[in-house]
Amino acid sequence: MRYVASYLLAALGGNSSPSAKDIKKILDSVGIEADDDRLNKVISELHGKNIEDVIAQGIGKLASVPAGGAVAVSAAPGSAAPAAGSAPAAAEEKKEEKKEESEESDDDMGFGLFD
C-alpha cells in the first residue's frame, strides 16, 4: 500500500510517470525502505494508466466490500405505533445479537489475506 500511495502522491503532484527513484525518494523522506520487487510491480501495473480512472475503479471495487455500516436502526420507543407491541422489538434484539456474533467472524471482509 505504501508504494501505491507514494506513486499516487507523485502522480497527483504533477509527475505523470513516476519512476522507482521518485517513489524511493518519497518513501525515504518518511523513513521507509523500499523493496525493489514490490516497487517495480506497482510501477509496471500503473504505468501508462490514468490515475483518476484507477481511483474510480478502486472505489467501485470497494463499494462491493461489506463495511458493516448498514445496520438497521429502530425508531425511538415513543415514536412507534401503539399496535406494534413489544414482540417485534424482542425479535429485533435477538437478530441484533446474532448479527454481532457473525460480524466477529467476518473481520476479513469477505476475503482472506492468505488464501
Swiss-Prot record:
Residues where N6-acetyllysine is found: K21
Regions of compositional bias (Basic and acidic residues) in chain numbering: 91-101
Stretches with biased composition (Low complexity): 76-90
Keywords noted in UniProt: Acetylation, Phosphoprotein, Ribonucleoprotein, Ribosomal protein
One of the record's GO molecular function terms: structural constituent of ribosome
One cellular-component annotation, GO: cytosolic large ribosomal subunit
InterPro entries assigned: P1/P2_N_sf (IPR038716), Ribosomal_P1/P2 (IPR027534), Ribosomal_P2 (IPR044076)
Signal sequence region: none
Coiled-coil regions listed: none
Positions bearing N-acetylmethionine: M1
Modified residues (N6-succinyllysine): K21
Family membership: Belongs to the eukaryotic ribosomal protein P1/P2 family.
Name used for this protein in its record: Large ribosomal subunit protein P2
The organism of origin for this protein: Bos taurus (Bovine)
Gene behind the chain: RPLP2
